[in-house]
Amino acid sequence: MLPYPQIDPVAIALGPLKVHWYGLMYLIGIGGAWWLAARRLAGFAPEWSREKLSDLVFWVALGVIAGGRLGYVLFYDLPAYLHDPSLILQVWRGGMSFHGGLLGVLLCSWIFARRNGKGFFELMDFIAPLVPIGLGAGRIGNFINAELWGKATDLPWAMIFPSDPQQLPRHPSQLYQFALEGVALFAILWFYSRRPRPTMAVSGLFALCYGIFRFIVEFVRVPDAQLGYLAFGWLTMGQLLCLPMILGGAGMMAWAYRREARLAH
């Protein structure tokens, strides 16, 4: 068993002002994606200024934060937030939904694409390889918060999380997700997108791979207590929300390559 590193959730405290690691990880993720986007901009929209890129980052960040929070409220714990709506604003306590954030990014990207004369899927193919940076940073934030831990196990890398009332050795599922959704997904998309691909193929690969990775990790992750398992004694809300991503991502890639083949003839 590995010891859980005791990290204060507050990264910086200046009097009454407290900066939590969870929020800081979001800033690091957005900043890292911004930096990488600037490096890739010449191949996507050489006519865009850095100010235009900053506008895009703002819209994407808005979609991530607003969509992620509202998605968690709607998908995972609506009764609690209806009982005390002030909890919606307490983002530092955790409670962000990737799938809600994805919907927020899709909406904001659609608005941005229409305003700037870019195709929606063309823009999404540019954004997709940047997303794993934020996902990886967010999972580190979950780990520091000692939340979203996994099921009990006797594996040598199991950890006892301070927030676990049972104090059992558990899968560090946040680190599994960091490795898959952050590191592995970034590597796959980065190398795949280095060559020209059919429009929609990169974003389709993102949806497919994320859906598969998340679906797998959910088997060792403890489901949200207020939801439990939705069906079959194992299906979680996360897995249910990933099924459309897996099917949709595979369909997007198939359609993209078929369309390219038709145009080639």
Swiss-Prot record:
InterPro entries on file: Lgt (IPR001640)
Subcellular location: Cell inner membrane
GO biological process: lipoprotein biosynthetic process
This protein's UniProt keywords: Cell inner membrane, Cell membrane, Membrane, Transferase, Transmembrane, Transmembrane helix
Membrane topology according to the record: Multi-pass membrane protein
Transmembrane residue ranges: 10-30, 56-76, 87-107, 117-137, 172-192, 200-220, 227-247
Chain residues that bind a 1,2-diacyl-sn-glycero-3-phospho-(1'-sn-glycerol): 139
EC numbers, comma separated: 2.5.1.145
Domain of life from the UniProt record: Bacteria
GO CC term, one of those recorded: plasma membrane
GO molecular function: phosphatidylglycerol-prolipoprotein diacylglyceryl transferase activity
Function according to Swiss-Prot or TrEMBL: Catalyzes the transfer of the diacylglyceryl group from phosphatidylglycerol to the sulfhydryl group of the N-terminal cysteine of a prolipoprotein, the first step in the formation of mature lipoproteins.
Family the entry assigns: Belongs to the Lgt family.
PANTHER family the UniProt entry points to: PHOSPHATIDYLGLYCEROL--PROLIPOPROTEIN DIACYLGLYCERYL TRANSFERASE, PROLIPOPROTEIN DIACYLGLYCERYL TRANSFERASE
NCBIfam families noted in UniProt: lgt
Protein name (record): Phosphatidylglycerol--prolipoprotein diacylglyceryl transferase
Species whose genome carries this gene: Azotobacter vinelandii (strain DJ / ATCC BAA-1303)
